[in-house]
Amino acid sequence: KKNNLDFAGLMYTESVFKSTIEVSPGPEFNFINNKDIQLLDEEYFIVSSNNRMGYFFENGLSPNNFSIITSPVIPGTIQLTPSGNMIALMKDGQVSGGYPRILQMNELSISILSQKKQGDKIKFKIVELS
């Protein structure tokens, strides 16, 4: 397969090495300002406390006092906390949340992120749904 890489005799899919995660705007994407939208182009460090429920990112956006009523979330939802940090919900994540849902990952992006560990860097690439 053309997308497989041979490394030390083991075959890996290219996604193991990717650090760019495609996301689409979430329902509350319009809550964030233009400065924070530009910050989404920066690299984000994955911090500790990651598990099958969620991944946490170090470089945050502006602190905020946004609140929404408890709303449904699905795997791949990226929520913005009041401190400006982001949480990416994974396969075993909760089913509802009260933080703004600013981004949404697709299945491939969830798989790429799930292969990352503490200290790894990722970048978001915002793609529009067609």
Set out the residue ranges of the language-model regions:
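Conserved "landmark" site that anchors the functional core of diverse proteins
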Residues: 1-130
